[in-house]
Amino acid sequence: MNRPFAKADGRFVFCGGLRWHRSAIGLYFPRTLAGELAIMSQRGIVPVDQLWLSIRREAESVLASDPMFGASVSAAILDHRDFGGALSHQIGERLGRNTADRQRYSRIASEVFQASPYLVDAASRDLQSIVANDPARPALLPPLLNFKGFIALQAWRVSNWLWRQDRIDLALLLQSLSSDSLQVSIHPSASIGTSVFLDHGTGVIVGAFAVIGDEVTFMQNVTIGRKRALPGRAPRIGRGVYLSSGATILGDISVGDYAKIGAGCVVENDVPSGCTAVGVPARLTNCPEPGIPA
């Protein structure tokens, strides 16, 4: 019988009958295809087709072990040809209030993903970021089906594409639906990178013209927006920034790469790369020594 987290050689542990392997950044993932993808994602991004294969295998396993729940999994995953189709279905299911609406919004998302395959690739990176950074979600299927922060972000990607195509009213409609259904409001004019993680996905507000870099993590109740004095200028958030719960970032400011914003912090001035901002108003701490990379 395996002892919980009994170390073998420092590279893996045993827990719950599974062999969990240690990733390059010290996180453990189960020895499954999804777990191996998580480890691979530390070295580079897994292609969409390979990710989709892993998701389908997880869905097939669920269908075999739990036929009652498996029927829902079939509709969400196995009935679709590719990752974009499954994403479109999830967006429609989450935003629609009746069958006709769900079909309509799913069709809109599908058309956008077909017109811009890059958005599907971006979604795959977002999903991999969840698995790589949240040990509580070692598989791909649960966040895809149940994590509203992930779906809200993909709905925003659709609305942002529509906004850039000058389909303003439809873009704003999707924002409103996402806010109502998912408690995440991201303006279609914002700019957001990839490998972005909306943990908990509740109470997140990103205002117009905000710029969010790659690998940013949002906790719940984060607000990023403009000030009344400069309505055309919004915050710019760098790569790898961690935004703790209740953080508020306002105005024409920059938050540098890999900075951390503390819980409940109100930031109205620039935060240099690698620094931590805490308090109300924010003060800086734990900044890198001069000449040392953040």
Language-model regions, residue ranges each:
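Terminal amphipathic alpha-helical/low-complexity segments used for targeting or macromolecular assembly
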Residues: N2, V13-H21, G26-L177, A294
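Structural signal for interior beta-strand "rungs" in well-ordered beta-sheet cores
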Residues: S179-E289
